[in-house]
């Protein structure tokens, strides 16, 4: 109840997207090629998933982290900052852009999640959803991801972000999340616990590639 928790993981089906690690970058992280000689197309897989702007922690699955950082730095809201972006251009999947922002201030915590997705695979229409959670309950979290399962094309996430249990200390929670991920496809995991009283944080990074 005294800490705000963020977890972000990446999965990979192709050699190109499996060839990645998370590295710390200032107060945030970025993705980097594990073996630079095998990097084919960096455009959608090399980015900063986590950046910190004052008392706000931004977490996304693409370079929209920078769009949100720059927008909020100019006093735009999270939702306004994302209006200039849409789903990724990777036909036929049109991977949704998912984003989150955590706001810790004066002993209070709230967060919001966003998904920008095609209209059931129709790239002429972008569907935009923002979910805001004020004063979230201790021990609970919300989980949003890109796809709801396998298929061709891959079907985008639908509905509200899933209610999940958040328990244990940072090492226990990190182990639980990492061990729950598909062993073949998991690539990297980032976990951060932020003390709501003073904003201090602890971070864990797990990389399959070592």
What residue ranges belong to the model's regions?
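Conserved short alpha-helical segments that host acidic/polar catalytic motifs at enzyme active sites
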Residues: 1-210
